[in-house]
Structure formats: structure tokens, C-alpha cells
């Protein structure tokens, strides 16, 4: 049996079209022995963070068990403007686009995919978020491209009988992506005569596949087998059919409504080997793509602007001279009284989460200035001699804010609140949530 992974998968984030939940997909892939999988929702990347997080959770357990990590591949099935320019919004032809599967090969590719999808929504939206050849070429680095389903540019041109145009398109894609461009073949044969399903798709797929295989050989492009997954298990087909009725606003018994083949479930490796028994290389090429893809972290630390602290209070450089990294480590891993220190290993994890020891200098500097302002305000509100209760509460809150990395955020918020009150004449309420009960915020 040839190894195989799914590279064309729609989750429930393909709104009113995909029905599969990410955890169920990943769990099924792992239970079937797959080494990874892609998520390629229609026109969006809404599910990518959930996909990353769930795989990270699963891989944490797998690491403890001594197992290889399961590899997530981040992608999108994009719409490519049919007339070559995503800014065109004039005729019906502009309302959708050719389907194209775009996979991130590495972190650079992921960043480029984000740009492509964002620009498709912001600049190319016309019934669908559309990209175009110009953007694809501009942001091509680090991407792997596949020709998609019958809605793709190559299959559409083949079905229209324009083989030379299909060849030109293949040459264009291959010219940019080289060995990272693949042609897709799909086979959605309905075998149950009692099942109400679309039987025309398979006939079209067979005709298109024959030409694709010929063109692939002629132009030196590898072929991959995919299943255009929209639901997890075979017995989910009827529920998915109901979802399509909701999507198209049609009754179940409407004889004219859209039907899928009901073959679009997340098939096992064995099932895919059965469907493509005569094309083992198309199955094997999916794992070639899997092996090309690098793993990388989607998480990043919050990026906050620096609040300009007056120089007469001090500078960050002075704080660096005044405190050692060990001073800061103790301060950030103990309570507000400098007592009850965390175990070293736990403390190191906390510091790493804040951005590392070097970042602590900035946080400490901002925290001390926030404390300076808080005590200034407290003396105006409560008098020069603060009660122990007020002082303890201020110190406790300031310590919590500091050890969570929030002082800069509080300084920025108080700055625009003061501007709203004192300069712009904007009414400002007491706030909401836990901050409304904070003595420091008060």
C-alpha cells in the first residue's frame, strides 16, 4: 500500500460548504497512520490557528509517548480571477474564479499566503475573494501549488476543449514554481445505485484526468491524488447534503438543487489506494509534498508600541545599569513583597513567556513609571498618608500588571483616556471588566 496524506481538505470554516471539524479530521488522520495533512478552506484561513493549536496539543502528547510529530500543512483553496485581473468587477465571469490549492511550504510561504488571501479579500472581493496571476507571481516564494478540482483553471480549459490554453497555463505555473507545481486528479465515483448523488462529476473527472495525465507527462509535472474532502466519515454525507440545502436555500426534495457526489469524505489510506490503484505515484507524491513542508510556529509575542516615558524620570539604559538580570529574575518570579519565589524551572518558563530576560528591562522600566503615576494619583485621591490597605492593594496590583507584561498597555490606555477627557471633550465612562475595579486604574 502506498503512503498517502490529504492535501485538499475543507473544514467547517469553508462556511456552509465544509462540515468537518478540525479535531475530528486530525484524530482520524492519526488513527489511520497518516503523518500529516493540509487544511485548504475556500478563500480563507479562518481555521489555520485552530488547526495549528490542535496539532500542537496532539504533538505534545505524542512527544511524551516517543512518537513522531503529526505535521500540519497550512493552505487555502483560492479563487483566481478568470479574466486575469482581480480589480475587474463588471460581468458574471468576474463573480467567482478558478480554484487553486495554495500550500505554505515554509514560514516565508505562510507569510506570502497570508498576503495573498488578505489582498484577495481587500482588493479582489466580488462575490468571492479573488487573487490573480500578478499577485501569485509577486508572492510566489515558499509556496506549493496544486491545480485543484474541476473548478480549477486547467480542468476548466480542458472541459471547454481548449487544450492549448490548458497547456499555456501549466507552463505559466511551472515556470514560476517549478517542481513545487502539481496537477491534481480526483475520482468521485458513486457506486450505490440507491443513493441520490451527482453522478455526472465522475464522468467529467475521468475525461479531465486522462488529459491531465497526458499533459503532466508532456510537461514534466507530477500528479497528486486528492479527494476534495468536505466531511469526515462516509456516513456524514446525508448531513452534509442538508448543509448544502441551507447554503443554497433549497428543499431536500427539490429535483433541481445542487448535489455533491457524497464521496467527499476523509478517506483512509486504504480507501485512497483502492480508488487510485492504477496511479500509485499520484498517492506517493502527496507524501513528497509532506516531506517538503517545514514546521514552524504560528504563535508570537504581542507587539506593543513603546510608551514615551519622560526623560526626567529616567531611561531604559539607566535601568539596565541599575539592575542585573538576576535582580529582575527574582523580582518577576517572587510575590510583591519579594517573597515566595517560584521554582527556578517554572520561573524560567514565565520569563520566556514574557519575551526573555532582555525584554524584562523594558517591562521593569514601564512598571516603575506606572507605579510612579499610580502613587501620584493615590496621594491626590486618598491624601499624602496612604493607609496600609490602599498601599498593599496598589503594590499587589502593580506587581500583577508587571509580571503579566501589562505596564506599557496601561500607560498607553491612560494616555488616550486623558486625551479624551482633557483635550477632546469626549465623555469617558468608568470602564468595564476587572479593570473597572482596579485601584491603579482609578
Cite the ranges covered by each PLM segment.
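Phosphodiester-processing cores and adjacent nucleic acid-binding clamps
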Residues: 1-442
Amino acid at each position: 500500500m502506498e503512503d498517502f496524506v490529504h492535501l485538499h481538505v475543507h473544514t467547517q470554516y469553508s462556511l456552509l460548504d465544509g462540515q468537518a471539524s478540525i479535531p475530528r479530521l486530525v484524530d482520524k488522520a492519526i488513527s489511520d497512520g497518516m503523518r500529516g495533512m493540509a487544511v485548504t478552506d475556500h478563500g480563507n484561513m479562518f481555521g489555520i490557528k485552530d488547526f495549528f493549536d490542535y496539532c500542537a496539543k496532539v504533538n505534545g502528547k505524542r512527544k511524551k509517548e516517543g512518537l513522531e510529530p503529526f505535521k500540519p500543512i497550512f493552505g487555502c483553496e483560492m479563487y483566481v480571477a478568470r479574466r486575469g485581473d482581480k480589480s475587474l468587477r463588471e460581468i458574471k465571469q468576474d463573480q467567482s474564479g478558478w480554484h487553486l490549492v495554495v500550500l505554505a511550504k515554509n514560514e516565508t510561504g505562510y507569510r506570502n499566503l497570508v498576503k495573498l488571501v488578505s489582498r484577495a479579500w481587500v482588493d479582489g472581493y466580488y462575490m468571492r475573494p479573488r487573487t490573480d496571476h500578478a499577485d501569485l507571481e509577486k508572492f510566489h516564494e515558499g509556496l506549493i501549488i496544486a491545480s485543484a478540482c474541476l473548478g480549477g483553471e486547467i480542468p476548466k480549459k480542458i472541459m471547454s476543449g481548449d487544450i492549448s490554453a490548458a497547456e499555456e497555463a501549466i507552463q505559466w505555473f511551472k515556470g514560476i514554481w517549478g517542481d513545487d507545481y502539481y496537477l491534481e486528479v480526483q475520482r468521485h465515483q458513486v457506486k450505490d445505485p440507491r443513493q441520490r448523488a451527482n453522478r455526472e462529476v465522475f464522468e467529467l473527472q475521468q475525461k479531465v484526468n486522462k488529459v491531465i495525465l497526458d499533459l503532466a507527462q508532456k510537461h514534466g509535472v507530477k500528479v497528486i491524488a486528492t479527494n476534495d474532502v468536505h466531511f469526515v466519515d462516509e456516513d456524514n454525507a446525508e448531513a452534509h447534503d442538508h448543509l448544502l440545502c441551507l447554503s443554497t436555500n433549497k428543499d431536500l426534495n427539490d429535483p433541481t438543487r445542487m448535489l455533491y457526489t457524497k464521496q467527499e469524505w476523509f478517506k483512509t489510506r486504504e480507501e485512497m489506494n483502492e480508488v487510485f490503484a492504477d496511479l500509485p505515484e499520484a498517492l506517493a507524491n502527496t507524501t513528497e509534498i509532506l516531506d517538503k513542508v517545514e514546521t514552524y510556529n504560528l504563535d508570537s509575542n504581542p507587539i506593543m508600541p513603546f510608551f514615551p516615558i519622560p526623560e526626567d524620570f529616567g531611561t531604559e539604559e539607566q535601568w539596565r545599569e541599575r539592575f542585573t538580570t538576576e535582580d529582575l529574575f527574582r523580582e518577576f518570579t517572587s510575590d510583591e513583597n519579594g517573597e515566595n519565589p517560584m521554582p527556578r524551572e517554572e520561573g524560567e518558563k514565565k520569563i520566556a513567556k514574557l519575551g526573555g530576560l532582555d525584554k524584562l528591562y523594558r517591562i521593569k522600566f514601564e512598571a516603575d513609571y506606572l507605579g510612579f503615576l499610580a502613587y501620584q494619583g493615590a496621594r491626590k485621591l486618598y491624601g499624602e498618608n496612604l493607609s496600609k490597605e490602599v498601599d498593599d492593594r496598589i503594590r499587589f496590583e502593580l506587581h500583577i500588571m508587571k509580571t503579566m507584561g501589562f505596564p506599557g498597555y496601561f500607560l498607553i490606555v491612560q494616555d488616550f483616556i486623558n486625551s479624551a477627557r482633557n483635550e477632546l471633550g469626549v465623555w469617558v465612562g468608568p470602564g468595564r471588566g476587572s479593570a473597572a475595579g482596579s485601584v491603579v486604574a482609578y
